[in-house]
Each structure stands twice: as structure tokens, then as C-alpha cells.
Amino acid sequence: MRHPLSIPEVMLNGCYKGIPGHTPPFPLDKISDRNWNILKGDMTFPCAVLRSSALERNQMWMKRFLEQEDAVLCPHGKTTMSPELFSLQLKGGAWGLTAATIQQIQTYRAFDVQRILHANQLVGMAEIDYVCKELNENPSFDFYTLVDSPALVRILSDRAEINQTNLQVLIEVGQAGARTGVRSIDQAKAVCDAIAESPRIKLRGIETYEGIIQGPNDEEIETAIEALYSTLSQVAIMAESRGFFNQGPVILSGGGSAYYDMAARGVAAVPLQTERLHVIRSGCYLTHDAKWLDDYFQRMQIRTEVVGEPLNPPQEAIELWANIHSIPESGRCFATLGKRDASHDIHLPALKKWFRPGEHSQPTKLDGHKIVALNDQHAYIDMPANSPLAIGDMVAMGISHPCTTFDKWRFMPIVDDDYSVIAGISTWF
């Protein structure tokens, strides 16, 4: 997908976190003209920044991985909901974008995204009618959605007939006790039969998502993931043997957010005779993180050899900067950042660096300090007796789970390795 996106003009002012209050409104795409630098105190804190070198590194890492695994990437846009980052991903070779909700689909279309894989069920009348209208009015729009029941197939078929358009679907394979998706081959056959009865619904592939599988240890989780992809394989073989797939390559898709290798190899192992396309849907690869995804990556290195690694692993691209603003007692300080600024659903942010304006030329690694709690606007930090931190110092934090940090920022600056602001991104949650 090389189609240029339509990126809306965003005017920044002091209502955006990070922008000084008396700054006259200016377009986001002109932010480099401000000559701002994070370390010089040109922006207000807290401030979430994206490191340009890490974004580029992670993009190249994924490209090499996909080439090695003979797969394509349809990254989940819910991670960033940023047209600027969507454009970066599509220019980097992404096959399309994945969406989970109708709001995300509508937002992507506002940016003129031409291929969308809706990794969820499309069920509401208004939602189905919107997609049908987009397909009718835009012949280049390529759209896929998931089905896991004959009832849903009939709902889609009825609305598609009313709108006089066709809908491409993938059968979702799930797991007992987990989320959506057929649980058995018999359920999948019933869905296939319903699709075959509709002239408007076209079966294009099989899909699953392994990222929600839980277990007492890594080995049992990985065994369950292998079983899930075995079921996907059986469903695909059944659908091919009965002639259910429509014209075009059969799409075999896995999530891959934390299990890139298992998703890519799980779909590649399906023994079909038909031409096929292996699609993984990770959105978090672009920014990586400090703990959650990094732990998964370390585990992947144990499972498999990945091209270029470990010499050039992904890097965390998101940093949250704040000031130390209070040291009210021994062993405890506070930073100007909280739940409104950082993800906290999996792990709390981790202190990485500190910087003292007027004394340091570059940020320095900060060991022995730990964020132990967050309020809405405060970070509680345990500090050792020999801590160098003082009121007014700047601290940088790494995060876990990029999705729930991006949704707290309408704007993020992109910085070079000297923390000069060279660009920026907007988000549309």
C-alpha cells in the first residue's frame, strides 16, 4: 500500500500537553521551525516524546523479520491512532492497517487508508451500512471483517444485499474460555455453509489472535498457542477442501503483538494448495517499550533465531519526561507525571535517565530508583540514600504497553538523539 494518506492539519497551542502556554497557534507540521529542545526546557512537562532513531530502527527490524518469515504486516492502528505514524508504516511497506472498532475504521477512512482488516465482528446496522457505502463509493477500498457464526453471516448478508455490495470475510478461530472465534471444526463448517448460501459474502481467509492466551508459565502458553494455530490450520484445510474460499490468495492471519515468530510460523505451517498470504497484525513493534514487550522479545530470542538479532534488537521509542518537584521526606520524591500521562495497566513506568539543566550535557542513566505508585498527576518514587536527584531535575521514564500511553496524548514531539524536536505526531482516539 503506497497510497499517500490525507493527514489533517493540526494547530498546536497551549491546550496541548508539552506546548508552552503563550505560544501562538502553529501547524504541527511546522514544529521543527520552533527550534525547541527537550533538555533546554523549551517544552512544558510532562511531555511524551518519540525518539526518531528508535522508530527507524524498529521499522527496519520488522522489515527484516517479515522478509525472513515470508509474511506481510497489517499493523493494528489502535496502538497509536496517529496518521503520521500510519503514513510511516505504510510507506515502510505495510500491507494495510488493522482496526477493531467502527470509530477506528471511520477515522482511517478520513485519512484515506485504502486497505483495512477489521479484526473484530461488524454487527450494527449503521456500522455495516457505513462500510457498504464506503465500498460502493470507493472502488479502490479493500476491506475485510471477521465472522464466527452463521447468525452474523446472515446479518452481514442482509445488509450487504440492501446496499448492493459484497463483503469479504475471514473466519475467526478462537479458544474455549477465551474471546471471540469458532471453537471447533463443526462450528467453522456451519459458518462456511452460511457463507456459501449468500451471494454477497465472500470467504477470503482464516484468522486468529493468540495474544490473550494465559497460563502459569511461558511453556504452557506457547503450547496453547501452537494448539490454536493447529485449529486454524484444520479450519483452513476444511474450507479449501470444500471449495469455500473465494478468488484471490487465501489470507491466513495471526496477531503477533507479542509472539511475532509464533504467529508468522503458525500461519506459514498451514498446508494449503491454494495461493496464500501470511498477515500478522502487530501495532506495538514500532515503538516497542521498556518492560512488557521487551520481556516478550527476550523470550522470543530463546525460542528462535531472528535475523539481525540480538545485535540489533528493537528499542523503546517512547520516553516520558517530567520534573522532580518535591522531596518531602527521606527516600521519597515525586515527579510531575501520573495516570493521566502514562500507561499503568500492566507495569508502572520505569525511571531510565536524569538530567540537570546547566550541569549536564546529556541525560545520565539512573539506577536504584523505582516508581511505586501513580496518582492522576503524581509519580511516587522510592530513592536511595545516595540519590543524586534534586528538585528541578528532569527524569525520563520508559513505559509498558504503548497502546495505553498513546491514548493519553493528543500530540507527541519526535526528537533526534540530542532531544531537538524535529517533527511531531497527532492522535485521534
Question: Model segments located where?
Answer:
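C-terminal accessory subdomain/extension
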Residues: I327-F429
